[in-house]
């Protein structure tokens, strides 16, 4: 069971065995989102104690956001509300959008999810469909807010799933290209070595989660998309 975590508010100045399913393959059902009820409730309780600012950058997604302990150091000057949850899937992002996304009225939403979906046998088409559902839900209340998809990463521990992960990234990248309010953050290419395989120096011993160097690289790729530090506006 993922451990609950209190809300992370950075206010320093922006105060998975392989599942090689093609797009048309038989599709699996996602795990029940209610397994994360305690995690989401913990964020809500923390918000009641200390409400995060609106108009910030919102991170929502899986453990790669949840475990970003050096976020304030890697992206100084930005107001970032981090709502990552360990083991979260894209399906979970959609399910909890009303509670983890909409209340914050962010100026930019960054989603990192999809890797856990692939690890449980979900197809690229299913992950794309869930991301599209998330975009539709956000657009109902915040029609102009930019939404960025942070690509599924090539962790060495999940390299056996590389084909489906690439397919997932490609499907979402193509969808994002159809809407100027959507952004694709390409982490995949930067995390590959000269041999075309994943760089081993960017990962913890589990070979799934980024180490400090991996997060530094992520921050460098994200920074141009985030805009100027402390650039805040209400969507």
Give the label of every model feature segment.
Residues 45-57, 96-102, 136-139:
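Short amphipathic alpha-helices and their capping/turn segments at secondary-structure boundaries
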Residues 154-235:
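Catalytic His-Asp segment of secreted/periplasmic serine-dependent ester chemistry enzymes
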Residues 57-61, 80-84, 108-112, 146-151, ...:
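Structural recognition of the beta-strand scaffold that forms the well-ordered cores
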Residues 65-81, 90-129, 148, 152-156:
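Oxyanion-hole/transition-state-stabilizing segment in secreted/luminal serine hydrolases
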Residues 1-60, 65, 69-74, 227-235:
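N-terminal secretory targeting modules
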Residues 124-134, 164-169:
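Charged helix-capping and loop-helix junction motifs
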Residues 98, 102-105, 114, 132, ...:
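Sec-exported extracytoplasmic/periplasmic mature domains
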Residues 52-54, 76, 105, 143, ...:
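Residue-level preference for short coil/turn positions at secondary-structure junctions
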């Amino acid at each position: 069971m993922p451990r609950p975590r209190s809300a992370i508010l950075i206010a320093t100045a922006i105060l998975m065995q392989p599942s090689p399913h093609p797009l048309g393959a038989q599709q699996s059902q996602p795990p029940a989102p209610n397994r994360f009820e305690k995690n989401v409730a913990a964020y809500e309780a923390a918000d009641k104690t200390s409400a995060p600012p609106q108009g910030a950058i919102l991170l929502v997604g899986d453990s790669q956001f949840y475990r970003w302990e050096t976020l304030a150091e890697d992206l100084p000057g930005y107001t970032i509300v981090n709502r990552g949850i360990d083991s979260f899937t894209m399906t979970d992002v959609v399910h909890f959008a009303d509670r983890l996304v909409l209340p914050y009225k962010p100026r930019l939403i960054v989603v990192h999810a999809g890797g856990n979906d692939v690890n449980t046998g979900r197809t690229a088409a299913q992950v794309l469909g869930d991301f599209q559902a998330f975009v539709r839900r956000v657009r109902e209340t915040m029609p102009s807010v930019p939404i960025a998809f942070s690509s599924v990463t090539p962790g060495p521990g999940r390299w056996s799933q590389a084909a489906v992960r690439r397919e997932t990234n490609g499907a979402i990248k193509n969808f994002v290209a159809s809407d100027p309010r959507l952004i694709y953050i390409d982490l995949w290419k930067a995390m590959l070595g000269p041999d075309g395989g994943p760089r081993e120096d960017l990962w913890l011993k589990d070979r799934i989660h980024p180490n400090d160097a991996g997060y530094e690289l992520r921050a460098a790729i994200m920074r141009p998309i985030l805009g100027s530090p402390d650039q805040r506006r209400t969507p």
